[in-house]
């Protein structure tokens, strides 16, 4: 495993990927741009190094964990409003929370932009499940929560959890046991989608096949 955390520690950050990140390209001038306020990251753009911030509950601890995907139109991440604050609130309910700083889809840093965020989300779910025993989390009580474009990523994970988008070595499933989608983007179809999110993830000239594949409201099979 690529991280070690202490039970009940709060706001421990670890890498999603150790070594080479799949589907990545070197881009010397592509740097993360963070907006910091009162010592905390309010938002960040141009993410190319995905991380997870672990917020572990200390009181009335349940057996539940949630991976949080902040929104931002696939161009930036609202880390404070749709990440850290939500994680802290979940902690008051006894729920462990893991805020995912996922990669922004960019042809500068990715070979295939459409699968980049999904790769990070799948890996994050597997990493949390790998730590389930240590953190007293039930393997069947690991969910995902997402806002806006992060809601699209959460719904993509929920409907494409078994799609092989990187070489999987973990024995753990990436399937969320439950999904909480808050004002999510659930379609990439014209007239319905959030155009900025669609353009950022799929490109302005996306094929109809790709649009349909990432219109997750139509991908539900049960």
Task: Go through each PLM region and give its residues.
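Bacterial Sec-dependent N-terminal signal peptides
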Residues: 1-12
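Mobile cap/lid helix-loop segments that gate and shape the active-site cleft of serine hydrolases
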Residues: 34-39, 184-219
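N-terminal cap/lid segment of alpha/beta-hydrolase-fold proteins
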Residues: 10-64, 118, 193
């Amino acid at each position: 495993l690529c991280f070690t955390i202490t039970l009940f520690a709060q706001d421990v950050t670890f890498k999603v990927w150790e070594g080479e990140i799949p589907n990545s390209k070197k881009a010397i001038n592509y740097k993360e741009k963070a907006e910091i306020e009162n010592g905390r990251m309010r938002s960040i753009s141009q993410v190319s190094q995905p991380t997870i911030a672990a917020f572990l509950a200390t009181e009335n601890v349940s057996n539940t964990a949630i991976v949080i995907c902040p929104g931002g139109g696939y161009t930036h991440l609202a880390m404070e409003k749709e990440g850290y604050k939500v994680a802290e609130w979940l902690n008051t309910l006894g729920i462990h929370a893991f805020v995912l700083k996922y990669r922004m889809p960019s042809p500068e840093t990715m070979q295939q932009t459409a699968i980049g965020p999904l790769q990070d989300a799948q890996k994050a779910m597997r990493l949390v499940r790998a730590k389930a025993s240590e953190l007293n989390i039930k393997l069947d009580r690991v969910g995902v929560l997402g806002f806006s474009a992060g809601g699209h990523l959460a719904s993509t994970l929920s409907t494409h959890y078994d799609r092989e988008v990187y070489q999987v070595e973990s024995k753990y499933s990436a399937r969320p046991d439950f999904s909480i989608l808050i004002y999510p983007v659930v379609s990439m179809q014209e007239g319905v989608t959030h155009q900025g999110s669609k353009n950022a993830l799929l490109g302005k000239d996306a094929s109809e096949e790709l649009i349909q594949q990432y219109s997750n409201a139509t991908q539900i099979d049960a």
